[in-house]
Amino acid sequence: AYAKSLSFFFMKVSIVNIGNELLAGKTLNTNSHWIGGKVSSIGCKIESQITVKDEQNSIVSGLSYCLKNKPQYLLVTGGLGPTDDDLTRNVLFKFMKTESTFDYEYWKSLRSKYKQLDKKISDSVKSQALVPQIGEVIANPNGSARGLKFVKNDTIIFVLPGVPFEMKDMFLQSIEPHIIKNMKDPIFSKILRTTGITESFVYDSIRYWNHNKNKIGYYPSVYGVDIKVSNRN
């Protein structure tokens, strides 16, 4: 067995993925898998993770359900594009009870980018220049759909595009640093990997570690059993 990582474990995070194609199985939900792995690796606990339809009632229900658990962070992906079925932006504005303003400077920069690419910009793209009066926008270095940031009660809500490579860069540049900066009272964790022994044997061998000061997790696979030991000290 060997130790393979050291991390922190504290913040509660919930995830809402929005998209009919995700529910129908037409698109693999890689965003959920990637975000879950990332926030866990920096020391967060996934409180809940759900996928909802591109419909106002479904989105609101998903947000409300996750917020009941009072996570420190709620991460939302999908539905920020310019088409009619991209409802997330306007639904969030209503949910947060905020008006929006039109960012003429951003619209000007989008028109310039499209012109450089020799492409015609559609009026539908104007929706991506809307800015909440109560909230913030998050820069998107790889696309036109900027993210959003809100605070509801004690939960910080980040809304990101569903396009994986856009979402990942925005998470790494804006979301991850924010979470790490706000971490308090961290729990240290180590993962030990074993081979050639069963999960039941591992459990019987180390179950007395699992007292009030330690949290033990067992993760069996075809290669062996990983043991995650977490402790505040």
What are these regions (language model features)?
Residues 12-50, 54:
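Glycine-rich phosphate/diphosphate-binding loop of Rossmann-like nucleotide-binding domains
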Residues 18-20, 76-84, 161, 232:
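Glycine-rich beta-strand-to-loop/alpha-helix junction loops that act as flexible
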Residues 51-59, 199:
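Short acidic loop-to-helix transition motifs that present clustered carboxylates
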Residues 58-61, 86-182:
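Proline/glycine-rich low-complexity loops and linkers
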Residues 61-69:
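Short, well-structured alpha-helical segments in soluble
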Residues 69-96:
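Glycine-rich phosphate-binding loop
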Residues 151-232:
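Accessory alpha-helical/coil subdomains and C-terminal extensions
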